[in-house]
Regions:
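Short beta-strand-loop/turn "lid" adjacent to the catalytic site in phosphate-handling enzymes
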Residues: 24-80
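Phosphate-binding/catalytic loop of phosphoryl-transfer enzymes
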Residues: 69-74, 85-167
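Short helix-loop-beta connector
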Residues: 51-54, 121-123, 247-251
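Short glycine-rich, Thr/Ser-proximal phosphate-binding strand/loop in the N-terminal lobe
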Residues: 1-27, 143-144
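Short glycine/proline- and acidic residue-enriched helix-loop micro-motifs
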Residues: 16-29, 166-172, 222
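Conserved ATP-utilizing enzyme core subdomain
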Residues: 1-3, 142-236, 240, 250
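Short glycine/threonine-rich loop-to-helix capping motif typified by GTGT followed
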Residues: 68, 184, 245, 259-261
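Glycine-rich phosphate-binding loops at beta-strand->alpha-helix junctions
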Residues: 250-261
Length: 261
């Protein structure tokens, strides 16, 4: 069961992302988000008739405000202490910083979960986790590789909000009305991130509205449907490239996450 975030709170969260280190401005949004999460937890326990005593712990990664492992920095919205206090449950949080301090990327987190639930499998297996950004888990026996492949829904949803006044492209119906702009696609794929070898991670610090506008400015006006179609194919290509380069022998590929549908 899942609970959505109302549009007004989503807008506040987006504003916080523009100033990730202005903690004073984040206080109200942080409180609202934490309150929403607390209410959702209580609703889930009530809906499924689960006792608090049956819950071992809650994993809370928060909503990422800034993720810059090269600068030893990763921050998020949401107060785990408040959530623990109001639900009387153990809350585990701040997953990323320790790994970053040890020289890691702090992301993606899903690779640990994918490895754990499949630890007895010895065959080649691949997971693609689709959210705002896409990450991949490549598992072969005890060997596991996980990294971000690039944008998934983030650029697509952003374009839909600005150009179609829609939160997302339901069923890819809007993108299907356009054509792939091959020259724009080539420009997008030429980004330096795709030349970096894993382990690596990325986010809206690298791929955002300004980044997209920089590439669009190289061409005369492109039909909004064509841009959306190109962004969608861009996501597909970057995922396929990652599979082909690091695990071409994969025969089982599982898609998961909010964008899997």
């Amino acid at each position: 069961k899942s609970f959505g975030i109302i549009d007004s709170l989503k807008k506040e969260i987006q504003k916080c992302k523009l100033e990730p280190r202005n903690h004073k401005k984040h206080e109200k949004t942080d409180y609202k988000l934490s309150s929403k999460i607390i209410t959702s937890i209580k609703n889930i326990l009530s809906h499924y008739k689960i006792k608090s005593s049956d819950i071992t712990c809650i994993g809370f990664p928060g909503i990422t405000l800034e993720h810059k492992p090269s600068k030893k920095r990763s921050s998020y919205l949401g107060d785990p202490n408040m959530i623990a206090s109001k639900t009387s449950l153990i809350v585990i949080s701040d997953f990323r910083q320790c790994d970053i301090d040890a020289g890691g990327e702090g992301a993606p987190l899903s690779a640990f979960f994918h490895n754990y639930i499949n630890k007895k499998r010895k065959d080649f297996i691949t997971f693609i986790n689709l959210g705002g950004f896409a990450n991949i888990t490549l598992k072969s026996g005890q060997k596991v590789l996980g990294f971000d492949t690039g944008p998934a829904n983030y650029l697509i949803d952003m374009w839909c909000r600005r150009k179609f006044n829609k939160g997302f492209d339901s069923g890819g119906k809007l993108a299907s009305k356009g054509n792939i702009h091959t020259k724009l696609l080539k420009n997008l794929l030429n980004d330096r991130y795709f030349k970096i070898k894993p382990p690596k991670s990325t986010g809206f610090e690298d791929f955002n509205w300004e980044w997209l506008q920089k590439h669009l400015s190289k061409f005369k006006s492109i039909n909004r449907f064509d841009v959306l179609s190109t962004l969608t194919y861009f996501t597909i290509i970057t995922i396929a490239d990652a599979i082909n380069e690091y695990r071409p022998e994969s025969r089982q590929i599982y898609f998961c996450g909010g964008g899997a549908k």
